[in-house]
């Protein structure tokens, strides 16, 4: 079954699915700043748009261009500065 998720007053939305690929969501984010907490490991890939990421333990935001990924362990938090509306893929580990 496909799960529909909305966060931050509808500024972040995703569709979740589990299949032979694994558990993942495909979503969109409006431009803005967000903080997410993880309950499992995540691999985030920017499909389209522009964002900067502050990974756990860092004070700096780093650019991750379209097609690039970053990984966050379970029970961590990370911050995003989304500079333009974007599309992303999140794979759960």
What are the roles of these predicted feature ranges?
Residues 36, 53, 89-90:
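Short hydrophobic/aromatic-rich beta-strand segments that constitute the beta-sheet cores
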Residues 10-11, 19-39, 66, 71-74:
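Conserved short histidine dyad/triad with adjacent acidic residue
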Residues 54-56, 81:
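A generic structural motif
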Residues 1-16:
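Extreme N-terminal tail/first-helix region
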Residues 73-93:
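Ligand-binding loop in jelly-roll beta-barrel domains
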Residues 39-53:
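Short, conserved beta-strand element in jelly-roll/cupin
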């Amino acid at each position: 079954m496909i799960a529909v998720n909305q966060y931050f007053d509808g500024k972040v939305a995703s569709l979740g699915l589990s299949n032979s690929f694994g558990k993942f969501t495909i979503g969109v984010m409006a431009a803005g700043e967000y903080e997410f907490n993880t309950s499992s490991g995540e691999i985030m890939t920017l499909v389209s748009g522009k964002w900067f990421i502050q990974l756990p333990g860092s004070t700096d935001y780093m650019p991750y261009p379209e097609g690039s990924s970053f990984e966050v362990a379970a029970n961590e938090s990370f911050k995003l500065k989304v500079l333009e509306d974007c599309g992303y893929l999140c794979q759960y580990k």
